[in-house]
Regions:
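Phosphate-backbone binding and catalysis cores of DNA-processing enzymes
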Residues: 1-119
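Loop-centered beta-sheet repeat module
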Residues: 120-193
Length: 193
């Protein structure tokens, strides 16, 4: 894969953009790739949603998500969230998604029933954190949006830093840099950083 990811916060926009980068631009084929789990939307870096190959989502997220997770941690106190609440959100998400993908409203309903009050930005924050920690990812199209799925069941096994790069960060950074320069060049190291 020459590219690593493309920004994808606007789902219809990123589907169209991805389709335009294929030999036969067809948004239906992009949706089919999402449904098959070959491409995925995730939060690998900068607190932004990206569309990327499923085989790259976990290792890139493990490599790049620490700054956005630190920034998110600073936003928790005003939301009334702490690590205990996030642990409960993760536990309930793992249980709720164990039988397969579910919609965001369904997951937020599970959190509401668990006393986690997902309104007022709390649900988004909990979901962002679980995606940036490679616990949950966007999964198949449900007709109006993407359902949410467990990374462990939706993304390829062995696609983490340990599986792809023997846990070594330097070869992973080199791969990411090579792909960045191939898709964005000419560019500098500062551009990459």
């Amino acid at each position: 894969t020459a590219h690593v990811a493309m920004q994808g916060q606007d789902l219809p926009g990123v589907i169209a953009s991805a389709a335009l980068r294929t030999p036969r631009p067809d948004p239906g084929e992009v949706l089919a790739e999402l449904d098959a789990g070959r491409i995925v939307r995730s939060y690998p870096m900068r607190g932004t949603v990206f569309l990327m190959p499923s085989s790259d989502a976990v290792w890139v997220t493990q490599l790049c998500s620490a700054p956005s997770l630190r920034a998110a941690a600073a936003r928790r106190p005003p939301l009334g969230l702490d690590e205990g609440a996030l642990a409960r959100a993760e536990e309930t998400a793992l249980e709720a998604l164990a039988d397969g993908p579910r919609s965001r409203p369904e997951l937020f309903g599970v959190w509401e029933a668990a006393g986690l009050a997902p309104k007022g930005g709390r649900g988004y924050h909990m979901l962002f954190t679980l995606i940036a920690r490679s616990t949950v990812c966007h999964g198949p199209w449900n007709g109006t949006d993407q359902d949410l799925a467990l990374v462990s069941s939706w993304l390829p096994a062995g696609s983490d830093l340990a599986g792809r790069f023997n846990g070594e960060r330097i070869p992973a950074v080199a791969e990411l840099l090579l792909r960045y320069l191939s898709s964005h060049g000419p560019a500098t190291i500062r551009d990459f950083a």
